[in-house]
Amino acid sequence: SPAGYQPYDSVLMLLAALEDPGLTVLPTHRVTTTPLPTYDKVRALLVDQFELQEFPFTTGTQGAVRAQFIEALRTNGRKVPMFGLALKGDSRYVTLALKPAHRPPAQASPRAKLDVSLLQQLVVATLCPTPQEQEAILYTKDDHEALDWVAKGTGTGALLLNATKVSEVQAVATAGERMPHKSTYFFPKPLTGLVM
């Protein structure tokens, strides 16, 4: 070992092939904890940039409607930038499909084209405009946990994303850019820890 080397000078790394079919990137959903406007006001703020599709529910239909909402988000989100929205005290889920006029141009940087970048710029910055509001956002990889936090009052709004594709991560890295904050959750995680 080199002179002066200490064990704390090293970092544990795991290298995996990007093409490995077992390598998955899970979405990192946002849950706001600061007060948000009513749904009508949120709709007015977002309707110019997004096509909104509402999934209203009752206590008896909430589970089935939630499943339809998540399926619509996953299926349609493969074609266009799309997000999911749920607000505390509101009995509907909403998908937000970015209108063509507001999508990044083909020559935009790979980072600018990411769903997570678009969500941050167009939705989070609109609903949580101050740094303090953005710092109070909670994160989860689980759709149902995000929606449950809002239903139970832990959060005021859930913003659901589709997962970043491994190819998108590669494109950002190849362009010499950094991924946005909380944009990837690689799975499976390597086992770490101490054995005693």
Question: Which role does the model predict for each range below?
Answer:
Residues 1-196:
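Surface-exposed, charge/polar-rich loops and edge strands
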